[in-house]
Regions:
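Hydrophobic faces of well-ordered beta-strands that scaffold small-molecule active sites
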Residues: 18-23, 52, 77-79, 107-112, ...
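N-terminal binding-site loop/beta-alpha segment at the start of enzyme catalytic domains
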Residues: 1-75, 105
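Short, acidic/polar
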Residues: 30-44, 87-102, 122-123, 146-151
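Beta/alpha (TIM)-barrel catalytic core signal, keyed to glycine-rich beta->alpha loops juxtaposed to Asp/Glu
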Residues: 8, 115-170
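Active-site mouth loops of central-metabolism enzymes
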Residues: 23-35, 79-89, 112-113, 118
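Feature marks short, surface-exposed loop/turn motifs that line or immediately flank catalytic pockets
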Residues: 26-28, 58, 85, 113, ...
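Acidic/glycine-enriched edge-of-secondary-structure segments
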Residues: 53-55, 80-86, 136-137
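CE4/NodB-like, metal-dependent polysaccharide N-deacetylase domain
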Residues: 91-111, 129-133, 154-155
Length: 170
């Protein structure tokens, strides 16, 4: 059997990822399904779906961390800060909480989940510092429109925004 080449996405830092990721929204809500959900994530990773997406609001980062614990170097781990926590201090604290729950020293891609009340300047400053501290490898946003993206990349440090994750569920 001939091995088929899979498409990949390459981020600005050279990190590559399968364009089809595993979302985890609604996982972790049933203790009875915990083992099954962990195994499903692990199976996806084994098949090459190395992007695993979670968020602080999903309340399942511990489950996601457990699923990827034995293959962390193979996984591109995505998590998101809630807009209500996206002040400078709030972003840094939310990231620390996520790191603890995920059981990892770094998050590969940390996103602002959607537009909120905090100024983008604060969020961008926090994301830039988290990246410099090695707590996140890349940062970006989720669910932003063109005007928001133009605003973000115009800010000091805004050119570090690696992606806008657009909502698309199958």
């Amino acid at each position: 059997m001939k091995k088929t080449e899979r498409p990949i996405i390459t981020f600005p830092n050279g990190q590559t990822v399968c364009p089809l990721g595993q979302g985890t929204w609604k996982m972790g809500q049933s203790a009875a399904r915990r083992h099954e959900e962990i195994r499903a994530l692990q199976h996806g990773i084994e098949l090459g779906m190395n992007l695993v997406d979670t968020a602080e609001m999903y309340d399942n980062e511990e489950l996601v961390g457990e699923a990827g614990r034995d293959c962390r170097e193979k996984v591109l781990l995505v998590s998101k800060v809630l807009p209500s926590n996206a002040s400078y201090r709030g972003t840094k604290l939310a990231c620390e909480r996520s790191l603890l729950k995920l059981g990892t020293e770094y998050i590969d891609l940390y996103l602002l989940h959607w537009k909120g009340r905090h100024p983008y300047e604060e969020t961008v400053r926090a994301m830039t510092e988290l990246q410099q501290e090695g707590k996140i490898r890349l940062w970006g946003v989720s669910n932003m429109d063109t005007a928001d993206m133009e605003r973000i990349v115009s800010l000091s440090g805004g050119s570090g925004c690696a992606t806008d994750q657009v909502l698309y569920n199958l």
